[in-house]
Amino acid sequence: MDISAYQHMNIRMSTRGKRPLRNLTPNDKVRAIQRIHNGETKASVSRDLGVPESTLRGWCKNEQKLRFMCRQLGPDHLGIDTHTPPEKRAKFDLQLLPPKLATLPNYDDLGLSNFLFSATEFPTQKESLFEKLSLVEFVKKNGLHPSAIRELGDTHSLNAAANAVSGVDYSTNNMINQLTLLAQLNSKLSYQMGESADTDIKSPQSTTDITDTAREENSTKTSCPLLTVKNWAKDPAKRAHFNQATQLNPNNDKNNNAVDPSYSNLTTMKYPLIMEPVKSIYPETTVSAIPPPPFSTYSDLASAASAPTTDNDCQGAALLDWCKLFNASLNFLAFAAAAASMQPAGGTIPKSTATQLPATEADETYPFNNNLVKRLSPLAHSDASNESYFDSEPEDLSVRSCASVSSRNNSRSQTPDKSTATSIACLSDGEQ
């Protein structure tokens, strides 16, 4: 037997004269099957391979399995590219390619283009749409009341035409709207601070020499009040009580200044829960060490009470809307207004004058409107939270504003910082 005829078929002969070992690869078997498909007889192919014809027929029956085994071996062991037909070679090449991921179907191919909203009809401002959706989720989580949402919609509907023309984003417009509302409140505060700075510079340091011009300015301020920490929720119907509480009965304290003892009654009427423990611990002269603010006469108060109060109602309504929108309480509003009033207006007033600015706020100390207070802060009037409410920061700030009045009058004996510290210490001891 000629062994050279089997060299190209990768057949090894262990010894001469014996049948060759049939360690044919699947590639060799597939090549033999392809030769049969090309027209060669099975006898000639079986004679070349050295296998019986029955074995070759078995290979032809298992042709698909043999081709699968060739694909598993990889392209290095194939070698049948020239013998396979084009259609089978194309299918074979597709099996070797990496699998393609299924692409998403087109929107119009799904037959949804006849719907009300198509993919091409959406505006290009996608960020504004996402921000509106996030705003809706924010409102749901924070639990804003539906009435407040309707009021917010009414306020935004006024600027709808301007937004359509300018194309301003919804979140930016919302922020600008709220900053405008805050600017209106702070503009009233800064306007009053400017007037108070002028009156403090022009007025003498002693409180005993109060002129008629100062009384006229105070009367005009009480007739047309501005938004401050003390009168932002005032009730004009209760102004008549101040005529009885502000009868001047001068006493002399340890600094020899004119002191009104009825101011302690005023403080007790306004802050009853704070001043009762203070009165029980400290004597009457210690509580009444704060000088009284100058008030107008009974005729001026009567004329102011008969004047229309639309400005006050508008201020209360604007404040209530602000409170509903920001979900704030009375403590936060009083703290913000007091902090804004303590700062100098425009940054042009020196620091020595800025410490004296809240002195004119005592000119307009009116009782709080109970209805507005209850609507703004429901927890403030509950029996369980009275102590926590009066221990909060806005009440301390109001005491500081009153103490700044006494610091200006007692500047000959002590500094404003010391007077403020002593008044706060008295308040903390009284609360304990």
UniProtKB/Swiss-Prot annotation:
DNA-binding region positions on the chain: 42-62
The entry's keywords: Developmental protein, DNA-binding, Nucleus, Phosphoprotein, Transcription, Transcription regulation
Subcellular location: Nucleus
Domain of life: Eukaryota
Domain HTH psq-type: 15-66
Keyword Endoplasmic reticulum in annotation: no
GO BP term, example: regulation of DNA-templated transcription
Chief location category: nucleus
Annotated Polar residues bias: 202-211, 401-425
A molecular function (GO) term: DNA binding
PROSITE patterns in UniProt: HTH_PSQ
GO cellular component labels: nucleus
InterPro entries for the chain: Homeodomain-like_sf, HTH_Psq, RD_transcriptional_regulator, WH-like_DNA-bd_sf
Segments for region (Disordered): 195-221, 401-432
Subunit structure: Interacts with itself, dan, ey and dac to form a complex (or complexes) containing the RD factors.
UniProt cross-references to PANTHER family, sorted A to Z: PROTEIN DISTAL ANTENNA
Function noted in UniProt: Probable transcription factor with a role in the retinal determination (RD) network. Regulates ato expression and is required for normal R8 induction and differentiation. Danr appears to repress Dan expression, but Dan is required for Danr expression anterior to the morphogenetic furrow (MF). Dan and Danr lie downstream of so and require dac function for highest levels of expression.
Protein's name in the database: Protein distal antenna-related
Lineage: Eukaryota, Metazoa, Ecdysozoa, Arthropoda, Hexapoda
